[in-house]
């Protein structure tokens, strides 16, 4: 069962301290009776609806700021994964080059086992050495899915700067004027411009949240693909290093036998 009685409004939790209990929900029945009671109830309901709309708009704006912040963290993590991929690929190329050099050394060792035949073969058919590849000549690229996700999210960086709670205040850029609760005494609910503005703000924030969550999903899926591909590189690298270690030990034994 709920921890709060039925008279409490759960939406009050958003704007208050975590340790505080939510304010009780009030409606027209809580107002005193009297000659002006119907007008007071109507006035109160208008103000209450407007206050709730304002709180909801503020809540969605905070959620939007957190979404952009999460997206920025996701982009930074994705870029770090891309750099890690470059390190792994360069390491794999270095191991391949070491293996190639070791094979050439083994051929030389086998050739000089016979003094005459080894010298003849060595000068007659010297193995063609492949020039070593320069590290960093080609920039490593992440998988296409992650690359597209990073590019799409970086286009939203300006929105992140505009919505970050440490860089702006909600009332600095909101089109809804502050203190609107006192301006509804003569406005009918369907025609209240302040309420309409809050609704537009809420709808806009929810639309941006929906699109932003889609981008976050793309980043997550791209990172998953990138991690899986890097796992494959690590598996190949581990196998090559183990094989290289065996060949090095074998070459050492052959050198000692000369």
Curated annotation (Swiss-Prot):
One Gene Ontology cellular component annotation held by this UniProt entry: cytosol
Bilayer topology term: Peripheral membrane protein
Protein name: Synaptosomal-associated protein 29
Subcellular location: Cytoplasm; Golgi apparatus membrane; Cytoplasmic vesicle, Autophagosome membrane; Cell projection, Cilium membrane
Family: Belongs to the SNAP-25 family.
Organism, as annotated: Pongo abelii (Sumatran orangutan)
t-SNARE coiled-coil homology domain ranges (all copies): 196-258
Modified residues (Phosphoserine): 77-78, 114, 163, 182, 185, 204, 210
Subunit annotation: Forms a SNARE complex, composed of VAMP8, SNAP29 and STX17, involved in fusion of autophagosome with lysosome. Interacts with multiple syntaxins including STX6. Interacts with EIPR1. Interacts with STX17; this interaction is increased in the absence of TMEM39A.
Sites bearing Phosphothreonine, chain numbering: 130, 137
Compositionally skewed regions (Basic and acidic residues) per UniProt: 18-32
Region Disordered, annotated ranges: 1-41, 127-190
InterPro entries associated with the record: T_SNARE_dom
Function: SNAREs, soluble N-ethylmaleimide-sensitive factor-attachment protein receptors, are essential proteins for fusion of cellular membranes. SNAREs localized on opposing membranes assemble to form a trans-SNARE complex, an extended, parallel four alpha-helical bundle that drives membrane fusion. SNAP29 is a SNARE involved in autophagy through the direct control of autophagosome membrane fusion with the lysososome membrane. Also plays a role in ciliogenesis by regulating membrane fusions.
Record key words, sorted: Autophagy, Cell membrane, Cell projection, Cilium, Cilium biogenesis/degradation, Coiled coil, Cytoplasm, Cytoplasmic vesicle, Golgi apparatus, Membrane, Phosphoprotein, Protein transport, Transport
CDD domains xrefs: SNARE_SNAP29C, SNARE_SNAP29N
MF terms in GO: SNAP receptor activity; syntaxin binding
Biased composition (Polar residues): 132-144
Chain coiled-coil ranges: 76-107
Biological process, per Gene Ontology: autophagosome maturation; autophagosome membrane docking; cilium assembly; protein transport; synaptic vesicle fusion to presynaptic active zone membrane; synaptic vesicle priming
